[in-house]
Design a protein with these regions (language model features):
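Short amphipathic alpha-helix segments
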Residues: 134-136, 159-183
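A structural-propensity feature for long, helix-poor, extended segments
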Residues: 48-97, 385-423, 431, 436, ...
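Short glycine-/aliphatic-rich beta-strand segments at the starts of folded cytosolic domains
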Residues: 147-163
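Regulatory modules associated with amino-acid/nitrogen control
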Residues: 3, 14-17, 32, 37-44, ...
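Conserved phosphate/anionic-ligand binding catalytic regions in large, soluble enzymes, centered on
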Residues: 14-35, 345-365, 407-414
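Alpha-helical support elements that line or immediately flank enzyme active sites
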Residues: 24-40, 163-167, 362-375, 419-427
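C-terminal regulatory domains involved in ligand/effector binding and gene-expression control
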Residues: 88, 129-133, 145-150, 187-207, ...
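Functionally critical mobile loop/hinge segments
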Residues: 86-100, 424-545
């Protein structure tokens, strides 16, 4: 029996590794464009991108570089590719005409829905509708008019049969030749024919399968959607080890092992990877996080700025050196590394979790404690595994993204993950780890997501800095015996319910909250004028926070 998909560490929580930007407004749209480009199967000559005029992309268009991400994805770039920032220039060089349209959207009700309508140089056509669901994760809604949901965790072989000519014997023969089949679906649509989709753990050989795929019949064609995620789903995936801290703690007590060891086992069950691979992968991510927090201070790099994106890290460094700083100790160091995390330097890869760069804010809080307490890299690594477990529970029970649960889902979840990680790092008990996470999340429950276009990263930066800088405080409260009352899963459920009750204008559409204030309206007007007069390649990366 196939196990239903569930969140895992390297796909959902700490991923995708990407260029600076929003995970849901930059990495996600890029990935959907990448799928659309593969569906087309040849270089594009015409790229039409349709966006919901009432959706989130319409509200923030430009300030998060959704446009460059979508176009770059169609050109074949993944979220970690620095060429994304030159997507329009490269599309023009390739002879591809690009247009965007804001319209009524009927194919999806998700606030982060997008439709790609592509024409290729050889005359092929392709349409893909998809949703950016948060944290860089995506889902397809339709491909070439056929309903199909896939999240990029397998290879997907698509067989289109416009005239319904492929018989059962041919289907059976094809399926016998497919390697490591994870799942399949078949759907018919009047006027379009039949689509058969095969989810595979390894890439099929289209050349070898060509006879079976097309069967020499008119109106039959095939395409492959390549995986987007580092961990590819397997047929023998084990069930989810835990979906609450209560269950997680029970396993740790029964097995007499620390929480981080149970977290490693969770990922082994989810991914099928051996223990050594998982630890090495987390260590690699920790290295990327370390560079993101420190590159602006330690490397000879240019920090891209604009009238709407100042060099916050440079300002903080000058202030700290002046002797006038009020914050000191762990808090001052957390601020320093957090500003480094948000520098938005092309080529300095970032690790989301759950928002763009979120893992690096978590790392900033952890690293400040590591410095102050003289802890080892292994101590920090153990904390990251605990943070990943908290993130997996959050993704299981909620949708930690601004478009669904407001800034609670992003800054609030990051704060909970960081508080839990710090408590683990300094030797807290499993109960104290849970209390720290729940206390932190409760403090940030109910926050809207209302990024101000042209508002120098406000109020987003205030919130993530608050969550980051309070993480060690909530760890201390838990260590001192302050009980959270709500177990973590209940705190997540409460935050989810409140977040989903917020009106659309408070869910990353830049239509309400702080965005409705007169000063914010003036910022928007200034930004829109600058955006209209500037070229895409002249704009800094879309690192809002």
């Amino acid at each position: 029996m196939t196990v239903a998909a569930y969140p895992e560490f390297f796909n959902d929580v700490f991923g995708p590794v990407m260029q600076p930007g929003s995970s849901s407004h930059f990495a996600g749209p890029c990935r959907l464009g990448y799928l659309a480009g593969h569906l087309l199967g040849e270089p594009p000559s015409l790229v039409r991108i349709l966006l919901d005029e009432h959706g989130s992309f319409a509200g923030t268009f430009g300030i998060m570089a959704e446009d460059r991400a979508m176009v770059g994805g169609v050109l074949g770039f993944q979220p970690d590719d620095e060429r994304l920032f030159r997507a329009f220039e490269l599309a023009e060089e390739a002879g591809a005409e690009v247009s965007f349209e804001f319209t009524e959207f009927t194919e999806s009700r998700h606030p982060n829905a997008v439709k790609f309508v592509l024409t290729g140089r050889g005359g092929r056509a392709a349409e893909l509708v998809g949703n950016s669901t948060g944290g860089g994760m995506v889902e397809t809604v339709t491909v070439n008019g056929f309903p199909l949901r896939t999240i990029g965790d397998t290879y997907v072989l698509l067989v289109f049969d416009a005239q319904r000519q492929i018989g059962e014997e041919q289907v059976a023969a094809l399926e016998r030749e497919l390697p490591e089949l994870v799942g399949s679906s078949e759907v018919g649509v009047d006027g379009l024919g039949v689509l058969r989709a095969y989810m595979l753990a390894v890439e099929p050989d289209l050349v070898a399968l060509n006879g079976l795929l097309t069967a020499g019949l008119p109106g039959v064609g095939a395409a492959i959607l390549r995986p987007l995620l580092p961990v590819i789903s397997q047929l023998d995936r084990k069930p989810q080890l835990f979906d609450t801290m209560t269950r997680w703690r029970e396993i740790a007590a029964r097995e007499d092992v620390p929480l981080w060891e149970v977290a490693v086992q969770y990922e082994m069950d989810a991914s099928g990877w051996p223990r050594a691979w998982i630890i090495d992968c987390m260590r690699m991510l920790a290295g990327l996080m370390r560079r993101q927090t420190r590159a602006v201070y330690e490397e000879d790099l240019v920090v891209p700025t604009s009238p709407f994106k100042p060099d916050f890290a440079g300002r903080w460094a000058a202030h700290a050196a002046s002797g006038r700083a009020v914050a000191d100790g762990v808090t001052a160091q957390t601020i320093k590394w957090a500003y480094g995390a948000g520098s938005g330097i092309p080529g300095v890869l970032v690790v989301p979790g759950p928002m763009g760069g979120g893992a690096c804010y978590i790392y900033a809080a952890m690293s400040a404690v590591q410095d102050a307490r003289g802890l080892s890299e292994d101590d920090l690594l153990r904390g990251l595994f605990v943070a990943a477990g908290i993130g997996a529970i959050s993704y299981t029970r909620s949708a930690p993204t601004g478009e669904v649960t407001g800034c609670t889902g992003e800054a609030g979840t990051c704060g909970a993950m960081a508080a839990a990680a710090i408590t683990e790092m300094v030797g807290g008990s499993p109960e104290q780890v849970e209390n720290a996470a729940s206390l932190a999340l409760q403090a940030f429950t109910g926050m809207p997501c209302d990024p101000m276009p042209g508002g120098i990263c406000q109020p987003c930066r205030s919130r993530i800095l608050a969550a980051t800088c309070m993480a060690h405080v909530f760890a201390d409260l838990a260590l001192a015996g302050h009980e959270a009352v709500l177990p973590l899963h209940e705190a997540i459920d409460v935050a989810d319910g409140i977040g989903r009750s917020l009106p659309p204008e408070l869910l990353c559409t830049s239509a309400g909250g702080a965005c409705a204030a007169p000063a914010a309206q003036r910022c928007r007007a200034d930004f829109q004028q600058w955006f209209a007069e500037s070229k895409p390649e002249e704009r800094p990366p879309a690192s809002l926070i």
